[in-house]
From Swiss-Prot:
PANTHER family per record: PREFOLDIN SUBUNIT 5
UniProt record, GO biological process: protein folding
Record organism: Saccharolobus islandicus (strain L.S.2.15 / Lassen #1) (Sulfolobus islandicus)
Keywords, alphabetical: Chaperone, Cytoplasm
Function: Molecular chaperone capable of stabilizing a range of proteins. Seems to fulfill an ATP-independent, HSP70-like function in archaeal de novo protein folding.
Family under the similarity heading: Belongs to the prefoldin alpha subunit family.
Protein's name in the database: Prefoldin subunit alpha
Gene Ontology annotations for the cellular component aspect, listed alphabetically: cytoplasm; prefoldin complex
A Pfam family reported for this protein in Swiss-Prot or TrEMBL: Prefoldin
GO molecular-function terms, A-Z: unfolded protein binding
Localization terms from the record: Cytoplasm
Cysteines paired by S-S bonds: none
């Protein structure tokens, strides 16, 4: 079909499929980051609960991947420093910290759900385009066999 007839070209379909594939990959990377953030919040809340229980020692990761742990002793206190966003932190009591973390987790969970919805739409559109491209390829193969 030509552009003049209101259709799209094969090259347009291929370009759209390529764009959607890259977009889906980007959404999946972002989704993974959001899930990692949720897991980090859960870990932070567990640490607060450990502090609240009166435990004076805790194992903490020294690096992000968990290659090195250190036992930290002498944990005393009823306050922790919580990340509020951007470059802002606040020292708050343990219960307030849990409330802040719960709110942040809810925000991230909503963002993850919205992202998942967008990912499903993009994947559906991508699959439709791939189906069309496969049909075009099969039709071309049949025509070539008929020659």
């Amino acid at each position: 079909m030509s552009q003049g007839q209101g259709g799209i070209t094969l090259d347009d379909l291929i370009a759209q499929a390529d764009y959607l594939k890259r977009y889906i990959d980007s959404l999946q990377r972002t989704q993974l980051e959001l899930l990692e953030s949720i897991n980090s919040i859960d870990s932070a809340k567990q640490a607060i609960e450990t502090i609240k229980s009166g435990n004076k020692e805790m194992l903490v990761f020294i690096d992000r991947k968990g290659y090195l742990l250190a036992k930290v002793g002498g944990i005393v206190g009823d306050k922790v420093t919580v990340h509020l966003g951007l470059s802002y932190y606040a020292e708050v009591d343990l219960d307030s910290a849990i409330k802040i973390l719960d709110k942040r987790k809810d925000e991230i969970s909503k963002a993850a759900q919205n992202l998942n919805n967008e990912l499903q739409k993009a994947a559906s559109t991508y699959n439709q385009i791939v189906d069309i491209l496969n049909q075009i390829q099969q039709a071309a193969a049949r025509r070539q066999q008929g020659e």
